Amino acid sequence: MTGQIVKDNKKRRLRQTIASFSKFAKAAFFVVLAFFVIGACTIGGFDAPGKAYRAVPDTAGSTDTVVFYLDNQDGKGLDEIWINIGSIYTAAGSDTTVTFNYASVPSTSASTISWSSVNRIGSKTFGNIYSSSGKGITGANYNWVRFADLENAENKTTALSTSYRLIKMEAGAEMLVNEVVFVDAAGKIIPAYVTMEEAKAAYGSGWDSRPALGDAFRVNPKDAVNLLDSQHSVRKGDSTYSNFTQDEAYSLMQIDNIFLGRQFYEGSVYEIDADSGPLSSLFMSLGVLVFGKSPFGLRIVPLLFATALVALAYFFGKELFGSDAFGLLFAGLFAAGGLTLTVGRLGLSFAMTAFCVLLSYYFMYKFCAKGISADHPVKTALTVLFSGIAFAFAFALDAKAVIAAAGVVVLFIVGAVRQHRAQAAEERALREEMSESNLKAPSEEIMKVNLAEYEEKSSALAAQSAYKNKLAYLFFFASFVLATVIVTLLSSLASYFSYVKFYEANPEKPVLGIFTIVWYALRDCFTVSNVTSYTSANASNAFGWLIGLKGATLLSATEGSSYLALNAQMNTAVMLTALVGFLFMTVYAILYLATGGKNGAYATEYSPRILRAYAVFALGLVTSLLSYAFSANASAMHSLLFTVFYIGFIPLAFYTAYVHDKSGATSVLGIKMNATVKVLFALLIVYAVVFVLMLPMTFCFPLHATAAKYCFGWTTFVNNGFYRI
């Protein structure tokens, strides 16, 4: 009975808690939930290759060789070979050759295996990330490539005879091969073996009488078994659901670099994810450790941060506007109108960095607007500490955050100045109170008592003010300086050996200290160095983000009349409204200041809140834009953080219009609306229409080329050659 009462009380408290939230807060919860569910269902599959085999040629110019034994159990010959190659340790854009050959089981008198001189399987050239020569396969890293298709009616070729049970793979450079899968003419996976024990068991009697057979498998590297440890992981398809983008290959490459550690092969080039900080790969490696090197595994952590970013937009909007409704508007527009559904769902650092930067702004704004409470000084000063810790993580994720977070420092300075002014005002109030009391004092003794009380209160106020100021400056230094150094150095430890192999002239004999190495890595974050086959086509000055000058293509598999691509671009209607909102609010701020400030014609009770919100969005917009303004390879893909602040001008403009709207409310579909709300709802309908039209390029699903042209081809002013065809 007692247990039932406790359970009923818990249910009642839960219902009361839910009932205490406004309808807009509940709607915001469902927006965030819907964003995560849609993202989780579309970021990609779970199929992942197992552990990687590290192919290392014996000497420069030689090849690494692995021999497979195929157990053609159903009497069907080899038709297809699928291969998943991870990191290729050559310069980005260079080509590397991989060759497969075949042979029959050698006779008892043969001393060597006679590999086919005709070799119907042949060789393929793989570009590392992309092929600068155009001769290699571009975008192959970490994606599945059908290496061979032997039974082909169009070419009039047939599957390989079952008498050819030995397959040799040769790699022309150091690389990580994640998996190799052999498929017969019936579409079934052929069991394959690389160890002598397994191959011998599959072959049966007569193995020992064929010394050449045993010799071939005896020299196979021990970790060659990793090539066959996840045979049902082949992902077929051209969209991002099945494939990684070339930009994501750098993320996976850096994760592999961490696991590779100090292993080094002379002549290899160990590329790194130079555009992101060391913490980025650590965060994403968590998903890879749990779900493997699958699209879901790499992208789940950035998706979680993107989801948290949408939630933070709601809370920040609520704090800025003092309204759940406008907080919901901010979160909804950002979730569906920005880049969160494209860039935010990929295995890149942008969503993680944007969340930490915005979180830093959020806490520092609370300090700037409210200061430090005299009743709870430590508790309220924690906003400075939390802001700095958020910045520390942002910096370790991407050093360019130091530019984007410059606005946070401005907010701190403004908050500190306001706090000093408030303290000075309290001191003046005490002095005036004492002066007034002395004017009315009937005797000199009472005046001395008043003076003593004033000195006591003034001394207490000075001590209290000094304590609050020390807390603010201490927490600022501890978090923005010490925490940043600590988080950055600690997160760099995992990537240390990859940095050594990238920056040292001779990695076997390093001469650079850890601080120098880390400094080089952080320095390189300020340039866009992760080059792909789309980089030059996507490149656009960051100031072009203001008008959506050029969209960025992250993956394109367009063929014939079928258009298939993932493009990063703001909702055009949202972008244009944000531009109008930015200009409108800038004019408002100028007129407010030009006409006398708080005593001028534009001053109202809402002005302080409006101007504080404008300052936050303007600071964030300018600093996030400047983060990439001087990077030659910057593109719309890099504008995720920028869109957070840019979109913020839409709810700010409508909030400003709404609180000053004197028009009477009329009923529309049973909802009371004034003129401002009617305009907003009309725009939301336009946003929704454009959003639907952009769905194919947002979620990368195929569409007829003509339909793509009219649906979203017009959403970029400058065509990069992939965005529209």
Summary of predicted features, one role per range:
Residues 2-31, 37-67, 237-239, 410, ...:
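Transmembrane helical bundles and short interhelical boundary loops of multi-pass, membrane-embedded
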Residues 249-259, 270-293, 543-550:
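Short hydrophobic/aromatic helix or loop-helix immediately within or flanking a transmembrane segment
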Residues 293-296, 313-336, 355, 375-378:
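Transmembrane-helix signature of polytopic, membrane-embedded enzymes
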Residues 274-282, 291-308, 328, 343, ...:
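Loop-to-helix entry region of an early transmembrane alpha helix in multi-pass inner-membrane enzymes
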Residues 320, 360-384, 394, 416-423:
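Membrane-interface transmembrane helices that cradle and orient dolichyl/undecaprenyl
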Residues 296, 300-321, 359, 584:
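Transmembrane-helix motifs of polytopic, lipid-linked glycan transferases
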Residues 339-352, 399-400:
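Short acidic/glycine- and proline-prone juxtamembrane loop motifs at membrane-interface regions
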Residues 220-272, 279, 523-525, 529:
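Extracytosolic helix-loop segments that constitute the early lumenal/periplasmic catalytic or substrate-binding loops
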